[in-house]
Amino acid sequence: MAMVQPKSQKLRLFITHLGLLIFIAAIMFPLLMVIAISLREGNFATGSLIPDKISWEHWRLALGFSVEHADGRVTPPPFPVLLWLWNSVKIAGITAIGIVALSTTCAYAFARMRFPGKATLLKGMLIFQMFPAVLSLVALYALFDRLGQYIPFIGLNTHGGVIFAYLGGIALHVWTIKGYFETIDSSLEEAAALDGATPWQAFRLVLLPLSVPILAVVFILSFIAAITEVPVASLLLRDVDSYTLAVGMQQYLNPQNYLWGDFAAAAVLSAIPITLVFLLAQRWLVNGLTAGGVKG
């Protein structure tokens, strides 16, 4: 006999679906509007969602090509967007790899080893992570100004300095990976030790292969945080050619000349690396996000 849903349940289902559709529309509308602005003629922030006439001039400029207008004028690319994009990917990729390496080894020590002050160190790391980076900008500038005198490749106006600054944000990732490690039975490592494995071999050959989901999550979160970060990068980087895309895009919004179309094209380009990284690692993402929430 067919089951008949009561009217109240149908109403709840309808309201739920309607709410989800509104939520999806609220997320998609800004993205579609940015794409529409990048395809309009001129540099205007207002207009319809569907352009009257599609123009690729902003995309050509963003990709480094000059644009020739009907009256014979030639507009060269105002900024090196592709170079900024490469700088962003390079800094974010190296930062993410470094954070995964540091967080993993640190979390292993907190999850498997006993030493005095372990709980205090864990809490202290988390407390320091709660302070916004803006509060440390003056100290960071002074620190990297002095470091650059002795180690030039991590001084001011260097990508090494930006990466070195980003590597300090590992506290939350240490907690996340530590929680994941504690869900893995330590008897596996004990069995490896009985077979003659050293602690490093047990960590590398037993624990790490089982921890790929959480490592993928930490890599993605670190990559996104680094590629979209502005305050620290804008403080440490001075030359236009050394900018990341997040910092360089501010050049389009000069109070005397707002290049909204060019800005929109660069903004869409900036989302491509994040999307690719997410698509490549999505099969591990859900497992990793739901597995590290263990009380430690």
Curated annotation (Swiss-Prot):
Keyword Ubl conjugation: no
Cysteine disulfide partners in this protein: none
Signal sequence, start to end: none
UniProt domain ABC transmembrane type-1: residue ranges: 85-281
GO cellular component, one term: plasma membrane
GO biological process: maltodextrin transmembrane transport
Cytoplasmic compartment segments: 1-12, 112-123, 176-204, 281-296
Major place of residence: membrane
Swiss-Prot/TrEMBL keywords: Cell inner membrane, Cell membrane, Membrane, Sugar transport, Transmembrane, Transmembrane helix, Transport
Presence of the UniProt keyword Methyltransferase in the record: no
GO terms assigned for molecular function: ABC-type maltose transporter activity
Family matches, as Pfam families: BPD_transp_1
Subcellular locations according to the entry: Cell inner membrane
Periplasmic side stretches: 36-88, 144-152, 228-257
Recorded superkingdom: Bacteria
Mode of membrane association: Multi-pass membrane protein
Record field: transmembrane: 13-35, 89-111, 124-143, 153-175, 205-227, 258-280
Subunit structure: The complex is composed of two ATP-binding proteins (MalK), two transmembrane proteins (MalG and MalF) and a solute-binding protein (MalE).
Role description: Part of the ABC transporter complex MalEFGK involved in maltose/maltodextrin import. Probably responsible for the translocation of the substrate across the membrane.
Family: Belongs to the binding-protein-dependent transport system permease family. MalFG subfamily.
UniProt protein name: Maltose/maltodextrin transport system permease protein MalG
